[in-house]
Amino acid sequence: MGVCAGKYEKNRYRKPAISRKSYTKYIRMDGRFPGEKVQVDIKYVPDECIRFPSYGCRYYQITAIDEYSRKRTLEIVKEKSTYETTKFIKQLESRMGFRIKSIQVDNGAEFVNDGDRTSKESAFEKSSKSFEMQLRRTRPYSPWQNGKVERSHREDGKILYGRKVFTSEKELRKQVSKHEARYNNTAKTVLNFRSPNEIVEEYFLKCNKCLDS
């Protein structure tokens, strides 16, 4: 009886182990200089703001925010796709006005491919690599890890989309552009009552003085 029981224990069915994807430990990094870390995300433009024929199209706002200076770049697009986010990343450095060392995104399909389904890189991932930008991904279901861009989107909802309506696509783009400029030139408590543009200007002015001395 004991031998048979031992054989049974040895040969009985065992449930296969499930391989789970591991994620790197989250390390908070607020940025020590402009471009060290930039958070990127996308939000939809509320339908109630659109007062012109959109013919079934939805509008989205792609946002990049520099952790050090809080400078932002906004872009309105018609689809939530790697095609649009890749176009955005290609012009990001020229629009920000400085080199970007790393960018952080969530795990949305408009940015990255699901590593559990394919080993291929998305167009966005390839583009980031070609510009020598380190790509960091937040952990799943952890929007707080991209907290600065998430909070800025909430402010956009209150200040821009909660107060205005747009009678044409041209007007939408114009108002978003004005909103971006106003944000980047407005003094903020977190920046010791300086604007994002002032923070960037002061940083590179100090760098130039160090090089000259």
Protein language model features and the residues they cover:
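Active-site beta-loop-alpha junctions of metal-dependent nucleic acid enzymes
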Residues: 57-58, 74-102
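Acidic/histidine-rich, metal-coordinating catalytic segments
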Residues: 80, 98-116, 139-141, 146, ...
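An active-site-proximal beta-strand-loop segment
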Residues: 35-73
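Basic, flexible linker segments flanking DNA-binding modules
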Residues: 1-38, 42, 109, 119-126, ...
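RNase H-like polynucleotidyl transferase catalytic core
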Residues: 104-107, 124-147, 165-166
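Short small-residue beta-strand/loop micro-motif enriched in glycine and branched aliphatics
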Residues: 70-75, 136-138, 162
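C-terminal domain-tail junction helix/linker
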Residues: 22-27, 36, 129-133, 154-213
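Short, solvent-exposed loop/turn segments at secondary-structure boundaries
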Residues: 51, 76-77, 113-118
